[in-house]
Design a protein with these regions (language model features):
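Cytochrome P450 catalytic core segment centered on helix I
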Residues: 78, 119-177, 181
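Non-catalytic, well-ordered alpha-helical scaffold segments
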Residues: 11, 49-53, 96-101, 144, ...
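Central I-helix of cytochrome P450 enzymes
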Residues: 96, 104, 146-147, 173-193
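Active-site substrate-recognition loop segments, prototypically the cytochrome P450 B′-helix/B-C loop
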Residues: 1-91, 100-118, 122-132, 136-141
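Short, contiguous clusters of charged residues that form electrostatic/catalytic patches at enzyme active sites
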Residues: 69, 73, 148, 186
Length: 193
């Protein structure tokens, strides 16, 4: 474990990834050996850079500009639906809902199923000790359901031309099109969370 906070030190660490490796994990807790979820944030160059570059176009200024009217419309609809003169849960009604809607947009994920994204985020980041799932087995089962759902989307997008959504970029990207299922799931979890 290491923590770097000064600018000069950060620059040194960034330039010396061989000594300050992100592989196989970026957390204090060791990665699960029986259910590994490799993701590009926990990889070193050049693989990290290649996979990150594959998807960064989805949030490039030009792409975000193209989504501006959709984003504004969804924000307005959520805000207009809020109760007036009575208390409400801001996190549930605004934060989670808007985040989930934006994720659905970035993935070009079926909008009617967007609540699955929130569930999978919660399951990915919380084990049985959090009360989100009852067991590690349930957690893994739900993450495999996530993988199955996204694999269907991947297969659809792979047959289509390249688009600006994250799944299409992963399916067509030279650095990501041949990922293992576990690596695909790991990168999905990274992008969802």
């Amino acid at each position: 474990y290491w923590s770097v906070t000064r600018f000069a030190d950060i620059m040194e660490v960034e330039a010396n990834w061989q000594s300050f490796s992100s592989d196989p994990a970026i957390t204090i807790i060791d990665p699960e050996e029986d259910f590994p979820l490799p993701m590009f944030i926990a990889m070193d160059p050049p693989k990290h850079d290649e996979q990150r570059m594959t998807v960064q176009g989805s949030v490039a200024p030009k792409n975000l500009k193209n989504m501006e009217s959709t984003i504004r419309g969804r924000v307005q609809k959520v805000l207009d639906s809020l109760p007036v003169g009575e208390p409400f849960n801001w996190v549930d009604k605004v934060s989670i809902e808007l985040t989930t809607q934006m994720l659905a947009t970035l993935f070009d994920f079926p909008f009617e199923d967007r609540s699955k994204l929130t569930r999978w985020s919660d399951v990915a980041t919380g084990g049985p000790e959090t009360g989100i799932v009852e067991s590690e087995e349930q957690r893994q089962e739900e993450l495999l359901e996530c993988l199955a759902y996204f694999t269907n989307l991947w297969e659809e997008r792979a047959k289509q031309g390249l688009s600006n959504d994250l799944i299409s970029m992963l399916a067509h990207g030279e650095a990501t099109q041949d990922m293992s299922p576990q690596e695909y799931l790991g990168n999905l979890i990274l992008l969802i969370v």
